[in-house]
Regions:
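Active-site bordering "gate/hinge" segments
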Residues: 1-248
């Protein structure tokens, strides 16, 4: 059994993470303007993920990720420099800004470079209902993937499996520019998939099914995903090539 305490998918504190990203973005903008940038824009993000792949009843991979990143674009007139960093410590952000500025100094001007006009920037941000956090540990995620594959293999015409996957992810990001705009985005995603093989020898066919939702509770059952993958795979059996011909479209 997997030690779920080691790879549990904890729910991030949305407000705390967005505040941290906003501070990082503001630091980048302030440093860029302080160094002489005519205008600048930046995006900071964080992603948390848990992904389990199984095949033929065995766990193949288990991945737990927590990635942060920041990108900064600096404009000197119509010359643009861009740099990114996966480290959001203040000193690293400042170095990233300085690299982008160095690039801008040696980049050919392009009249299409620059920020969007202020009057074209969004001022109202409706709630799109994309944030539905739920804590899932490695054990339960693995069981979902195994159950999904097992359901597909119940079909007697299924001869093999290319595996099943169960995953969950949380993403948060902040975009800001020197025109005073700042926007925040958040979202969750939960998914499951199954890939199966039917037939033998030269008559084998392969197909899949998956389900992906913002809210874990909206997912179809893993058994249904496996059964759909099996039905889609089996219906490919007996397929044959047709002769070249003219047909209505």
């Amino acid at each position: 059994m997997i030690d779920s305490n080691m790879v549990a998918q904890a729910v991030p504190d949305r407000d705390q993470e967005l505040s941290f990203l906003a501070d990082a973005a503001q630091l980048a903008l302030d440093h860029a303007r302080g160094l002489g940038a005519d205008s600048c824009e930046t995006s900071a993000s964080v992603h948390f993920g848990l992904n389990v792949n199984v095949r033929l009843g065995e766990v193949e991979t288990l991945e737990h990720s927590r990635d942060r990143g920041l990108g900064i674009s600096i404009y000197l007139g119509n010359s643009k420099g861009h740099a990114t960093s996966g480290d959001l410590r203040p000193e690293t952000i400042r170095k990233c800004v300085e690299k982008a500025l160095d690039i801008a100094r040696f980049t050919q001007a392009d009249k299409c470079n620059g920020l969007a006009p202020v009057d074209r920037l969004a001022k109202h941000f409706p709630d799109l209902d994309l944030w539905h956090p739920q804590a899932l540990d490695a054990d339960s995620t693995t069981m979902r993937a195994l159950a999904c594959e097992a359901a597909g293999l119940e079909n007697a015409k299924i001869s093999n499996s290319d595996g099943a996957t169960a995953s969950s992810s949380f993403g948060l990001s902040v975009y800001a520019n020197s025109n005073g705009f700042i926007g925040r985005r958040d979202g969750t995603r939960f998914s499951q998939s199954c890939v199966l093989i039917a037939g033998e020898g030269e008559s084998m066919q392969r197909d899949y099914w998956y389900d992906s939702r913002r809210a874990f509770s909206d997912l179809e059952s893993v058994e249904e995903t496996g059964h759909k993958a099996a039905r889609r795979t089996v219906r490919r059996l007996g397929a044959r090539n047709i002769a070249t011909c003219e047909v209505p479209v």
